[in-house]
Amino acid sequence: MAVEDFEAVLKAKYPGKAHAKRVVDLIRKTKPDANGVIYLEGRMTKLLEDNDSPEHFRQRRYFYYLTGCNLADCSFAYDIQSSKSILFIPPIDPDDVIWSGLPLSIDEALSRYDVDEVKFTTEVNSTLAHLAKQSPNSTVFAIANQVSDSVTFLEFGSKDFETVKKAIEVSRVVKDEFEVAMIRKANHISSLAHKAVIERSKAAATEQELYATFLERCVSHAAPEMAYHPILAAGKAAATLHYVDNNAPLKGKQNLLIDAGCEWNNYASDITRTFPLTGTFTKESRDIYDIVLRMQKECTELIKGGMLWDDLHLHAHKVAIDGLLALGILKGDAKEILNARTSAAFFPHGLGHHLGMDTHDTGGNPNPNDPDKLFRYLRLRGHVPAGAVVTVEPGIYFCDFIIKPYLDDHVHSKYIDAAVLNKYWDVGGVRIEDNIHVTENGYVNLTTAIKEVSDVEAVSAK
């Protein structure tokens, strides 16, 4: 999809009403006679501790999914019987106007958001009471600990604080066209920022200079919010999976691993690239990069709706083992190495996860207590449906803290050639990550950041 294509999709309103209907359908799968009101609150303004300034605002994702509204201090009601949606926005506070200007009006909100009616938040209780009386013994569906003390549900026959949250989490797994366009736009901007970082790398002296370059490019494209704290790790720091210091000097380091992505209207991108700081990969870095790129490409090609993610993760380990055997870092029989789980010393994390409004989006069903260390940190388990967006992010790392216990354990050390391994410590780590839209019979790669060796070296050498 070209830039103009996803921009055309994004000219429409965020499809909050369609999402609400999907959520109701899911609620009725477990509660066929469900009737009443869905009530959700957005993020309320909260001051910093010991300060009179507000905390950085991040909208509640459950609320946003049904409204597309990114304003603070709002509420939402959806009448299940009539399919009527009502957005509540804060009334004008004259004392606040002098500082912040006029807030969105009711007419402006009705024009901007996919709702049937807009009211002020001062009308929440009276509106809920009216809706409750329309259907005797109706239920209000809300989320526990996300209802203001001033809101009352006394008129409803029953209260349910669990079902709607679970239904929204299930609904969020399969993305519609608008959501995919949001993720694609976030990817487009982030891919431009990744390229800008590579272009800047030869002139930069520290990680934070490249960090600033990434932020600048995203902000200049109207995407100031990061989906997560960016990782810019030079040299051996790349062996730390979630390195966040971003302040070390670049001199004398082989590569830089950058894991960074912006949001577009609350939808995330999550991209990782590794590139040479000298313009050309060293032999050892190229060895590892080629293995990781093969891991990523082969796993991506296996993606289609309904596939079991565990199988894909297992395939990534098989490719890693083959590559490390060819280099001599591993030795012995590939099947024995896999069964011993020795490859987890070099590829300790999961292959990927769901992506959406959260970087680690809903629906992953991880099992952190899995006795099998190969799957313990896999954030996505089970079959992946068509319509989901996932990350594919294999990596190979040389982390002394992780690898040393394997070298000290005969079960694993017999498969590792320490002399060959010693040549690769300075590589640090290599990870390559793209965002993939799963289709019925295949996939669409939403990430356009360069990753072929010839392209990466050509840009980094400039």
From Swiss-Prot:
SUPFAM superfamilies: Creatinase/aminopeptidase (SSF55920), Creatinase/prolidase N-terminal domain (SSF53092). Gene3D superfamilies: Creatinase/methionine aminopeptidase superfamily, Creatinase/prolidase N-terminal domain. It is an enzyme of class 3 (hydrolase). Keywords: Aminopeptidase, Hydrolase, Manganese, Metal-binding, Metalloprotease, Protease. It comes from the Eukaryota. InterPro entries: Aminopep_P_N (IPR007865), Creatin/AminoP/Spt16_N (IPR029149), Creatinase/aminopeptidase-like (IPR036005), Pept_M24 (IPR000994), X-Pro_dipept-like (IPR052433). GO terms for biological process: proteolysis. One of its GO terms (molecular function) is metalloaminopeptidase activity. The keyword S-adenosyl-L-methionine does not apply. Its EC number is 3.4.11.9. The keyword Manganese applies. Mn(2+) 2 binds at residues 259, 270, 433. It catalyses: Release of any N-terminal amino acid, including proline, that is linked to proline, even from a dipeptide or tripeptide. Its cofactor is Mn(2+). Disulfide bonds: none annotated. Belongs to the peptidase M24B family. Catalyzes the removal of a penultimate prolyl residue from the N-termini of peptides. PANTHER family: XAA-PRO AMINOPEPTIDASE 3 (PTHR43226), XAA-PRO DIPEPTIDASE (PTHR43226:SF1). This is Probable Xaa-Pro aminopeptidase pepP. It comes from Metarhizium robertsii (strain ARSEF 23 / ATCC MYA-3075) (Metarhizium anisopliae (strain ARSEF 23)).
